[in-house]
Structures are given as structure tokens and as C-alpha cells.
Regions:
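Auxiliary alpha/beta "docking" domains used to position bulky ligands
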Residues: 1-152
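Amphipathic alpha-helical scaffolding segments comprising HEAT/armadillo-like alpha-solenoid repeats
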Residues: 245-248, 274-279
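Active-site-proximal loop/short-helix segments
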Residues: 165-189, 230-236
């Protein structure tokens, strides 16, 4: 089954809705079949590692893993359903991924804007695929039919209360956003990095969620996918980032920015401002 292929990569559940019910955010013409369905699924990535990187950033770049997953799915489709349409996306997607996943009944949308799943909370990376199989064929391939409804969280307010940057009402203050910015940061932005010590991304709002605490207690939060458990980075410093070969640096998702950005963040977090150029 198609779901067996997904499961072999660590996908725990997958759902689908008609293409017409999915929210497109791209004006690009992709040539999708009008009667196609969109499948949504996710990979859990959390491990209990102490780091000044967000949990996803301490693991190897998930985009590369998704590329392998999609190649395996395409091979399966070519063998079992030759000529049928299949195209996968992850992160760089024509769809509003969180909204799509919620409509596919994979979870609910939290006040922090991320999907919350029962087993892995928000420590997931989403993927989706446009597929030319019929509804009955998708069900036979082990993919569940989504309800098409968007549910919200319980609005307990923990993510808002625990955010160290008070970013609930001003996303420009979010540490994840600030640490990925190019150029010179404002003093208020630098203060946020100094306050938290984080040099790429942040997990505070996701860790604050009661669903995360329940998943942790139940033993479902941590991933068992070797790609995400092996090669993890702990606390990084300037020496480590500077000494990485280009090949190793590019294994991690923060490599979409030049390493000067990481070094800037590390210096700010350690209390030494970096007056860099061409960052």
C-alpha cells in the first residue's frame, strides 16, 4: 500500500481531501488534474537534546529526507498505478500546509499558528502530495479521508504566557523570525537573542503546549526515525560553525542562510555584538 511506503519513512498517519477543497497560496500554474486529491502527512522529529538551536534545526535538513520519501512514493506509483499523477511537496508548497493538514484531520491549529497532533504535538514537519488516484483507491492504499473541517486548540494561553519575546501579537518579535533575518539587527532584536540564548529558531511555545506535555508523558513525542536521531547537533559555537565543511554545513536547515548569519547570532547570544557586512 502507499501508506506502507509512507510508514517505512516514519509517517504515522495520512489523510486526503479533494484538490478543490485545498487552499492554494501560489499563483503558479502546476497543471494538477482537476479531479485529483491532496494527501497530507507529517514526520515527527523531536529528540531530547540540549541545544541553542531549535529542535528541528539540530537535526539534519528534513527537505533532503522528504526528497527520498517522494522518490520512493513515485517509484511505488509507477509500478502499481502507472500513468497516474503524483507530485510531492514539503515546505516550498503551493498549499497552506497547516490549514491543509487540519482539513485532512491530522490535528488542530494552535494559537501559535502551528498544527498540533496528538502523538507528536507540533514537533513535526509537514508534507503533501497531489495524487491522481480516486477516493476509493486512496482508501484502499491506506490513506484516511479527511473531514475537511479546521479545528482549533483549547486556547489555554500557555504558548502566549511563556513566549520570552511576547510575540503572540507581534510575529516580527518571534525568535525564529529574528534569528533567520539577514543584515544588522536592531537592539531590541539583539536583546531577545541575548535573553534566550537561542541562535536559530525557538521551541518555547511548542514545549509550553499541554499536548506536548501529554505526548512526552505517553512516550510518543520523540521520533524513532534514524535520519532525525543521528547526527544531531548540541550547543553550537562559533568555532564549530566556522570549522564545518560546506558539505556538512549544508546538511542542516540553517544552511539556507550564509554561515555569517549563524556566527552573528552566536556572538550576540554570547554578549559580543558582531558588526558584520554582507550578511
Amino acid at each position: 500500500m502507499l501508506f506502507d511506503v509512507l510508514r517505512s519513512f516514519g509517517v504515522r498517519c495520512a489523510g486526503f481531501i479533494p484538490l478543490g477543497d485545498a487552499d492554494l497560496i501560489s499563483k503558479r500554474e502546476y497543471g494538477f488534474p482537476e479531479d485529483a486529491f491532496v494527501i497530507s502527512f507529517y514526520l515527527p522529529y523531536y529528540t531530547n537534546v540540549k541545544s541553542n538551536l531549535a529542535n528541528f534545526a539540530s537535526a539534519r535538513d528534513y527537505h533532503q529526507y522528504y526528497a527520498e520519501l517522494f522518490r520512493a512514493c513515485e517509484s511505488f506509483m509507477n509500478e502499481k498505478h502507472p500513468g497516474r499523477y503524483f507530485r510531492g511537496f514539503a515546505d516550498v508548497s503551493p498549499f497552506a500546509e497547516v490549514l491543509l493538514a487540519a482539513k485532512c484531520s491530522l490535528g488542530v491549529i494552535g494559537d501559535h499558528g502551528m498544527l498540533i497532533t496528538k502523538d507528536a504535538s507540533s514537533f513535526i514537519v509537514l508534507g503533501e502530495a497531489v495524487c491522481g488516484l480516486s477516493e476509493d483507491e486512496l482508501l484502499a492504499e491506506g490513506i484516511s479521508k479527511g473531514e475537511g473541517k479546521v479545528g482549533g486548540c483549547t486556547h489555554c494561553g500557555e504558548c502566549r504566557r511563556q513566549c520570552p519575546a511576547d510575540a503572540a501579537d507581534d510575529k516580527s518579535r518571534c525568535i525564529s523570525s529574528i534569528t533567520q533575518k539577514k543584515g544588522e539587527l536592531s537592539e531590541s532584536e539583539k536583546d531577545i537573542i541575548r535573553k534566550t540564548g537561542m541562535v536559530w529558531g525557538c521551541d518555547v511555545c511548542a514545549l509550553a503546549c499541554p499536548v506536548t506535555k501529554t505526548a512526552m508523558k505517553n512516550g510518543t513525542l520523540e521520533t524513532d526515525i534514524p535520519y532525525f536521531t543521528e547526527g544531531r547537533l548540541g550547543t553550537v559555537d562559533e568555532g564549530l560553525i566556522s570549522s564545518m565543511s560546506d558539505e556538512k554545513y549544508e546538511r542542516y536547515s540553517f544552511s539556507w542562510r550564509k554561515r555569517e548569519v549563524m556566527i552573528r547570532n552566536i556572538r550576540i547570544a554570547s554578549g559580543t555584538d558582531f558588526e558584520g557586512e554582507n550578511i
